[in-house]
Swiss-Prot record:
The keyword Ribonucleoprotein does not apply. GO terms for biological process: tricarboxylic acid cycle. It comes from the Bacteria. The active site is at 265, 306, 363. Transmembrane segments: none annotated. Its EC number is 2.3.3.16. This is Citrate synthase. It comes from Pseudomonas aeruginosa (strain ATCC 15692 / DSM 22644 / CIP 104116 / JCM 14847 / LMG 12228 / 1C / PRS 101 / PAO1). Homohexamer. GO terms for molecular function: citrate (Si)-synthase activity; citrate synthase activity.
Amino acid sequence: MADKKAQLIIEGSAPVELPVLSGTMGPDVVDVRGLTATGHFTFDPGFMSTASCESKITYIDGDKGVLLHRGYPIEQLAEKSDYLETCYLLLNGELPTAAQKEQFVGTIKNHTMVHEQLKTFFNGFRRDAHPMAVMCGVIGALSAFYHDSLDINNPKHREVSAHRLIAKMPTIAAMVYKYSKGEPMMYPRNDLNYAENFLHMMFNTPCETKPISPVLAKAMDRIFILHADHEQNASTSTVRLAGSSGANPFACIASGIAALWGPAHGGANEAVLRMLDEIGDVSNIDKFVEKAKDKNDPFKLMGFGHRVYKNFDPRAKVMKQTCDEVLQELGINDPQLELAMKLEEIARHDPYFVERNLYPNVDFYSGIILKAIGIPTSMFTVIFALARTVGWISHWQEMLSGPYKIGRPRQLYTGHTQRDFTALKDRG
């Protein structure tokens, strides 16, 4: 793995030889672990040039628009697989056989119920609390209800916790929504698949149970797949860092939810809807497109381009197809959705956006789909957290399965040098 060497020359010091590591794909990595012995650290705010870990789970090539889960292109998984099969893949490294899939799906279904006492836990939150605030609290509290699987050094405990989290996230997410509306919380149904069950718990009531549209269930399943993992982003890195301290899995996932809540990370599709609100009407599109082109104007078109993908977002094509299917299924006459489709058409053909590869991304289409299905904007990041849980827990599992150290980033200190304490009476 370390076939090459790099040499670091620091003025006044002897050259330092550092191993260069090569992965199966992607850039080579300079191993700086030996640098500490020389009395030097590296400085990389935001870790933009730092590989914090070795991983076999997800690979991204932003320049080529590639996203692979365990080697499989995301487009193929979204088209040919389903969410629980993708979960199995992320957790175990290989696609399941028919028997393995049946057993895994059955295990997840057996864990979808939550402890009845958890319902009373919700009463401690205001009904108008942001759903992500409630999610952070409830998921963190699961360790108080399921403390029979908290030994992180026991592979069986880790597996049970992973299954419980994947199974219970849709139930808890739907409970959060129902609590905010003052409606009765719905129990999961084992005769429904993962996405159908979520929509059932979100939109059905004890007095009226409607069949779930296969088109909407498929759309929801694809949203889950397309958000299942995205390598070492802020929330995944947070989960790994929390996990490195030996924290229990529920606490680690709660930390990931907290990081995802940040608008710079998990709020992108929510920002798309806010932008559409700001534009207001189809007649205003040209004006706002010009504002987006003006470098001196603070207005930005949300849901176009991507920080990682410099060419195109491989998830966006699948999401656009899904968006078209949902809108056709529902036949909604919504001015905001009409505005979104018009904006998409302009951005896909305007030379300014085409030349800069500012195409609609997965957040643009997923926001439209979720709104069309009837999910309120405040729940968008909750859906993201639900889908991303398998990615977080897979990275947590991977870290604990091998040698690891507690995360301890260093700093470039620029504060005061040592000084003596001054008594209060002597301070100017």
